[in-house]
Amino acid sequence: MKSTDTTGDSSLRLELNVPNCVTALRVVLAAIIGYLLYQREPGALFAAGILLIVAASTDTLDGILSRRLGQETPGGALFDLVADELLFMPSLILAIVAGLFARTDGLMPLNPYLYAVPALAGGVSVLAGVAVFLRKRRTRVFDFPSPPPVAKANYWFWMAPLIVAVLGVGPDSFLAVLMYLALISTILTFYAYLKKGSYVFTD
C-alpha cells in the first residue's frame, strides 16, 4: 500500500477545470446514447454509434488536456474512471437487449455473453474499487492504483465491438473477432489490476 500525505495533490476535491468538463461531457453523452439505443430505430442507432465514438474519444482527450494543462488531480482521475463505466455499461446492456449482437450467433459460443459478462464484470470491479477506496480513505490516506498500461488499451477493446455492433458495419466475422479480442484484453487487464491494486480491497 502506498501512503501519501494529506496535502496538495492528495485531495479528492473535484475541481472545475477543462479536463473535468470534458469528462462531464462524456457522462452527458452517455445519457443521450442510452436514450437513442432504447429507441431501437435505425436513425437513432446510427446517431448512437457516432456519439459513442465521440464520447469514447473524450476519454483520450481529457487525459491529454490534464497533462498538458498541468491539471491532473486524484479526484479527476476517479471521475474519469466512473465516467468510462457510465458510458460503457448501460450502452452495452441496451445494445444486447436491442439484439445488436445477434449477427455473431454461431461465431461465438454463448453469444454475446462471452464478451459481455467479463466486460461488465470488469466495469463493476472498477466501480466497486472506487467505492471501497473512497470509504477507506475517510480514515486513512493512500493512493488509488493508477491504471496499468493494458487497462488504457482495454477500454478501446471494450468499445470497438460495441461501436461496430451499434453502427451495424463490417462483416459478422469482424465483429466476432473484436469480441474475442475484448475477452482476451479483459482477462489481461483484470490480472494486471489484481496484481497492482488488490490492496484497495485487502489493506
Segments the model singles out, each with a brief description of its role:
Residues I32:
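Active-site phosphate-binding strand-loop segment of PLP-dependent enzymes
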Residues A48-A56:
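Short hydrophobic/aromatic, small-residue-rich stretches within specific transmembrane helices
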Residues K2-N20, V27-L29, L81-D203:
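A feature for the membrane-embedded catalytic helix bundles of lipid/isoprenoid biosynthetic enzymes
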Residues G70-P74, T139:
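Juxtamembrane helix-boundary/capping and inter-helix hinge elements in multi-pass membrane proteins
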Residues G76-F79:
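Membrane-interface alpha-helices at helix entry/exit sites of multi-pass transporters
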Residues Y35-G43:
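Short, hydrophobic transmembrane alpha-helix segments
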